[in-house]
Regions:
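Extended beta-strand/beta-hairpin segments
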Residues: 1-69, 81-168
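Short, well-ordered amphipathic alpha-helical segments that serve as non-catalytic structural scaffolds
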Residues: 77-78
Length: 168
């Protein structure tokens, strides 16, 4: 799955690009092929499914479970990677994350909106507190998911209609 790249040989700046192709199968299951396009090439195969609420079979985690897992895993990865680069020894790391969304019923559908994102960090380290705090601050800035969630984003949707793509 992963190829070996020396971070010291990467350019000072780069675009990190991913793409994902999803195929609906079964009742509510989605099979996903995720490609890291640059600066390196990697491919991952994932799936999502829903439980009975949406009429699925719960054969894979629902998208929201993967969402919070991705956020938690991203900050944990950055803390561990940056601790090595910043020469900060950590003996143990645990993260407890919570996300709350608001859900509002509209006839037979619903709308959602994020309410809160909370990440509690437990680090065992003999390093001074200020160095551990600096590590967490650096990891926050290096976590692609946290940086994405921390700003307003525009998500463009297009629908294929015949030979054309229509903005939705």
């Amino acid at each position: 799955m992963s190829n070996s790249i020396d971070p010291d040989n990467l350019p000072a700046e780069a675009k990190v690009k991913f793409s994902c192709f999803g195929q609906a199968v079964g009742k509510m299951r989605n099979e996903l092929k995720v490609d890291m396009v640059s600066p390196m090439k990697e491919t991952f195969h994932l799936a999502t499914d829903e439980g009975s609420f949406h009429g699925g079979d719960a054969t894979a985690p629902p998208p929201l479970a993967l969402f919070i897992a991705s956020l938690t895993g991203c900050i944990m990865t950055q803390i561990r990677a940056f601790s090595k680069r910043m020469k900060i020894e950590i003996e143990d790391l645990k993260i407890d994350s919570r996300i709350t969304w608001n859900w509002k019923k509209l006839d037979n559908i619903y709308e959602t909106a994020p309410e809160s994102f909370e990440i509690d960090v437990f680090i065992e380290s003999s390093e001074p507190l200020d160095r551990v705090k600096d590590l967490i601050l650096a990891a926050k800035k290096g976590c692609f998911i946290e940086q994405t969630l921390g700003q307003k984003n525009t998500i463009n949707h297009k629908l294929k209609s015949g030979e054309n793509w229509i903005d939705v």
